[in-house]
């Protein structure tokens, strides 16, 4: 049996970023053959990653990258907020975002290109990691804002007088107020029709005649389309005016925006209470 030296363990650690004991064990099992040890560790890592893939990854980070009028916004997920702050995890997410922007690479291609590195990271960290989504936005004036690592916004503004601070404030507003559309006119007809019927039913159930209910709903629908659209919302920096009014005063128009929030739309596993955990342990 070959001698496993400290130098071999050190080299394997540098090449794989695995723990010292894992490296020593792999070298012993490979009889000191470092290349075989690496192959075995990769196979073992893939198996571990496959087992972890069923775990819900609803924490993570939002990364924004921008160059030459194009911005990429990316979500990479993990299982806990502790790992979401891990340097290795964040380095991985930034590397993926750089690659996405450089080649305008869609998510399926990114997932394939980074699968080997993802598996290595899962093995190192011990949590499921997933490249969830990426979107791109173009424009001469792009503003962005990240609220911590959990919320990211990019906006495209066509402006004559709006400075970068104003554009950033619009991005901050999107982060805080969660508009779904740019203007009230952008709200799809099916969304408007569905909400209108709900409001009519509410009015009728309150005892109003159908013709009166129809008239009441007109005002409610104007309020609804304003609340779900960026330009119709009260500007968080100055609630006395809407975002649309502020932009008009600046000679500016928002043409598009994207808002990502970590874990939105992912159904998280129900957390067990202490009593439930004890009961589960007793059941074996």
UniProtKB/Swiss-Prot annotation:
What this chain does, per the entry, is described as: Associates with the EF-Tu.GDP complex and induces the exchange of GDP to GTP. It remains bound to the aminoacyl-tRNA.EF-Tu.GTP complex up to the GTP hydrolysis stage on the ribosome.
What's the protein name? Elongation factor Ts
Map out region (Involved in Mg(2+) ion dislocation from EF-Tu) in residue numbers: 80-83
Query: Any transmembrane segments, and where?
Result: none
**Family designation:** Belongs to the EF-Ts family.
Indicate the segments annotated as coiled coil, or none if absent. none
Signal peptide bounds: none
Q: Where on the tree of life does the source sit, at the highest rank?
A: Bacteria
One MF term in GO for this entry? Answer: translation elongation factor activity
- Primary localization class, coarse: cytoplasm
Please indicate if the UniProt record lists Cytoplasm as a keyword.
Answer: yes
Q: Which Pfam families match?
A: EF_TS
The record ties this protein, via NCBIfam families, to: tsf
Give me the gene this protein comes from: tsf
Which keywords appear in this protein's UniProt record, sorted alphabetically? Cytoplasm, Elongation factor, Protein biosynthesis
Q: Where is this protein found? A: Cytoplasm
- A GO CC term attached to the entry: cytoplasm
């Amino acid at each position: 049996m070959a001698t496993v030296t400290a130098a071999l363990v050190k080299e394997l650690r540098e090449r794989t970023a695995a723990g010292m004991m894992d490296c020593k064990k792999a070298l012993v099992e490979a009889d000191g053959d470092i290349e075989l040890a690496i192959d075995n560790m990769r196979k073992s890592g893939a198996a571990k990653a496959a087992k972890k893939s069923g775990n819900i990854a609803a924490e993570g980070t939002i990364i924004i990258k921008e160059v030459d009028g194009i911005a990429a916004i990316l979500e990479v997920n993990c299982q806990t907020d502790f790992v979401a702050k891990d340097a290795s995890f964040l380095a991985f997410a930034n590397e993926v975002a750089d690659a996405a922007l450089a080649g305008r690479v869609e998510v399926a291609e990114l997932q394939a290109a980074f699968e080997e590195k993802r598996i290595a990271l899962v093995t190192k960290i011990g949590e499921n990691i997933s490249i969830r989504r990426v979107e791109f936005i173009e424009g001469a004036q792009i503003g962005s804002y990240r609220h911590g690592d959990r919320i990211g916004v990019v906006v495209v503004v066509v402006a004559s007088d709006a400075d970068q601070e104003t554009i950033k404030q619009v991005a901050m507003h999107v982060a805080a107020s969660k508009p779904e559309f740019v203007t009230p006119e952008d709200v799809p007809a099916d969304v408007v029709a569905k909400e209108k019927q709900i409001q009519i039913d509410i009015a009728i159930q309150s005892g109003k005649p159908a013709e009166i209910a129809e008239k009441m709903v007109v005002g409610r629908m104007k309020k609804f389309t304003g609340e779900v659209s960026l330009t119709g919302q009260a500007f968080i920096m100055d609630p006395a005016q809407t975002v649309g009014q502020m932009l008009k005063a600046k000679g500016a128009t928002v043409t598009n925006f994207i808002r990502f929030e970590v874990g939105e739309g992912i159904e998280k596993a129900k957390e067990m209470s202490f009593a439930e955990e004890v009961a589960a342990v007793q059941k074996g």
